A protein has these predicted regions:
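Long, charged low-complexity segments
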Residues: 147-150, 154, 384-391
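Amphipathic alpha-helical interface segments
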Residues: 1-144, 159-380, 396-494
Length: 494
C-alpha cells in the first residue's frame, strides 16, 4: 500500500501556527534532559539511546519549524531561498544525527538502538524498528542533497557554486514535499520511541524521579529589548526591505560578470592558435569571487535579522540568531582564515598579492581592512561555537550532541551578536569601496598592458605581412598566410 504523507497544506498550517509548538518542544527538551540528569548511573543504556533519538527528533522539528516560519513570513525571493536552504540543511543535519552517512552510519544512533533491541529479543519491536530503518536508508540515500547542506553551512572556495545552488531553489513546493516525507518518518520514529520508553520502564525496573524536577530554562531573555533597540521603531525592517532587492540584483550582476570572465577564458583557451596568458583575467576572477562571498554574507545576514525581528519567543529568536555565527564563520574561513592554513589559501591573501605596489591609497586601505579582519578573528571563538550550534551528533565520540547544542543556543548573547553584525557590516562597507577601486585599477592597468601588447603584436604581424608579400611564395601560400594573420589579429583585438 502506498504511504500517505501529510499534505503540503497541512504542513503549512502547522508551521504557520507553530510558534507555541516551538516553545513546547523547547520545554519538552529541557524537561527530558533534567530527568536524565537526575537518574543515577544505573539508567539502562536502552533508555539513554532511546531518549537521544527522541530529543534529537524534537530539536529537528523545532529547528525546521523556525526556518519554515521565517520562510512563510517573507515575500522576497532571495530571503525565501535562504530559508529554503536552511530547511534543507536542517533536514540533512537532522538525518545525520539519527542515521548518518557513509562509513559513519555504523555508529548512528538508530544503529546503536538496534544493538540494544537485539539483546532484548522482542520480535514486534525489531520488526517495527526495521521498517523505519528501511525508510531512513531510502530517504538518506536518494532524497537528501548533502551538497546544499555543505554550501549552506560552510559556503565554498568557489562562491559561484553557492550562487548556482541557491539560484536553483525556485520551488517551495518541492522543498515542502521533501519535508512532508521526512516529517512522516519522524512521526513513525516518535511513536516507536514512545513505545520503547514504555517498554523500558515496564521491563527494566527503571523508575523516573517522582519529585518535581527543577528545570532551568536558560535561554537569554534580552531578545525583546535588543529587537526594539535595533529595529528603532521599524526603521531597520524598512531598511532591510530596501536592501534585499537591491543587494540581490548586485549579486546577480556579479555572478553574470563572473560567468563572462569564464567565457572569455574558455574562448581564449579553445580559439587562440597559441598559448596566451592573461594574469589580469585571473585577478578579476578572484575579485569577483570575493565580491560574491561578501554579497552572500550581507544578504544572508539581512535574512537572519528579518527572521530575528519577527521571532515570537526567546528560543525562536536564539535559534534564528545562531545563523549569525554560522554566516560569520563561513565568511571568515574563506575570506581571511582562522589559522595559518586557512589564511594561506584565503581570498584575502590572493587579493593582497596583486595590489599595485605603487598605489599608496589602496595599500593603506588594505592595511586598515587587514587590521579589522585580524582583530575579528583573534578575539573570537567562532569555529568552536559554530560547531556546538550546528552538529547534533559527535562523530568523534559516537554520541548525541543535542543537549550541548541546545545549551549553545540558549547562551547566545543578542547584544554581542548585534555588535558582531555591525562589525561585519563595517567590513562590508570598506570591502565594497576597496574592491571597486581595485577592480577599476586592475581593469585600467589591464587595458594599458593590453594596448601595449596589442601594439607590439600588431607591429610584428605587420612586419610578417610585409615579409611574406615581398617573398617569392606562391599566391596560395600568401593567401593562406593572410587568412592566418587575419585570424590572429582578430583574437588580439578582442
Amino acid at each position: 500500500m502506498e504511504r500517505q504523507y501529510a499534505s503540503i497544506e497541512t504542513i503549512a498550517s502547522l508551521i504557520q501556527n507553530s510558534d507555541k509548538a516551538i516553545e513546547e518542544l523547547y520545554i519538552a527538551l529541557k524537561q527530558d534532559f533534567a530527568i536524565r540528569n537526575a537518574l543515577d548511573e544505573s539508567m539502562p543504556h536502552l533508555y539513554s539511546v532511546t531518549h537521544d533519538i527522541l530529543t534529537g527528533i524534537w530539536f529537528i522539528l523545532m529547528d525546521i519549524g523556525v526556518s519554515c516560519r521565517a520562510l512563510f513570513q517573507t515575500n522576497y525571493a532571495y530571503e525565501k531561498r535562504f530559508h529554503l536552504k536552511n530547511v534543507l540543511a536542517s533536514i540533512s543535519e537532522g538525518f545525520k544525527a539519527i542515521m548518518n552517512f557513509g562509513k559513519s552510519r555504523k555508529y548512528a544512533l538508530w544503529n546503536l538502538l538496534e544493538e540494544e533491541l537485539i539483546q532484548i529479543d522482542n520480535a514486534d519491536l525489531i520488526d517495527s524498528f526495521n521498517k523505519i530503518k528501511l525508510q531512513l536508508i531510502e530517504f538518506g540515500d536518494n532524497r537528501i542533497d548533502k551538497d546544499i547542506r555543505d554550501l549552506t553551512l560552510h559556503y565554498d572556495d568557489a562562491m559561484i557554486k553557492v550562487f548556482e545552488k541557491t539560484a536553483s531553489l525556485n520551488s517551495e513546493e518541492d522543498t515542502m514535499k521533501l519535508l512532508c516525507e521526512f516529517w512522516a518518518i519522524l512521526q513513525d520514529m516518535l511513536k516507536f520511541t514512545y513505545t520503547l520508553d514504555e517498554y523500558t520502564q515496564a521491563n527494566t525496573g527503571l523508575t523516573k524521579p517522582n519529585e518535581a524536577i527543577n528545570v532551568q530554562f536558560d535561554v537569554n531573555h534580552d531578545h525583546n529589548v535588543i529587537k526594539l533597540l535595533i529595529d528603532n521603531k521599524g526603521k531597520l525592517e524598512a531598511a532591510i526591505s530596501t536592501v534585499l532587492p537591491k543587494a540581490t540584483n548586485q549579486l546577480d550582476d556579479m555572478a553574470n560578470h563572473y560567468f563572462r570572465l569564464q567565457k572569455i577564458r574558455k574562448y581564449i583557451k579553445e580559439e587562440a592558435p597559441f598559448n596566451i596568458e592573461f594574469p589580469e583575467l585571473n585577478n578579476l576572477e578572484i575579485l569577483a569571487n570575493h565580491d560574491l562571498l561578501i554579497r552572500f554574507m550581507v544578504l544572508d545576514l539581512a535574512s537572519v535579522i528579518n527572521a530575528y525581528l519577527h521571532s515570537d519567543s526567546d528560543i525562536e529568536a536564539s535559534l534564528n540568531l545562531r545563523r549569525v555565527v554560522v554566516i560569520k564563520t563561513s565568511t571568515l574561513v574563506h575570506l581571511y582564515g582562522y589559522d595559518d592554513r586557512e589564511q594561506e589559501k584565503s581570498v584575502w591573501k590572493s587579493i593582497q598579492s596583486f595590489i599595485p605596489s605603487d598605489d599608496e591609497t589602496l595599500k593603506a586601505e588594505e592595511q586598515a581592512i587587514q587590521d579589522l579582519l585580524s582583530k575579528l578573528v583573534a578575539e573570537s571563538d567562532d569555529k568552536r561555537l559554530r560547531a556546538s550550534l550546528v552538529h547534533l551528533y559527535d562523530n568523534g565520540r559516537h554520541k548525541s550532541n543535542t543537549e550541548e547544542t541546545l545549551e549553545g543556543v540558549e547562551i547566545l548573547d543578542p547584544a554581542r551578536q548585534t555588535v558582531e553584525i555591525l562589525l561585519l557590516m563595517e567590513i562590508n562597507k570598506r570591502m565594497e569601496a576597496f574592491t571597486k577601486k581595485l577592480m577599476d585599477t586592475l581593469a585600467q592597468n589591464a587595458r594599458l598592458q593590453k594596448e601595449a601588447s596589442q601594439r607590439e603584436m600588431l607591429d610584428k604581424i605587420t612586419f610578417m605581412r610585409q615579409r611574406i608579400e615581398q617573398s617569392n611564395a606562391s599566391p596560395d601560400i600568401k593567401d593562406t598566410f593572410r587568412q592566418m594573420m587575419n585570424k590572429i589579429q582578430n583574437i588580439i583585438l578582442l
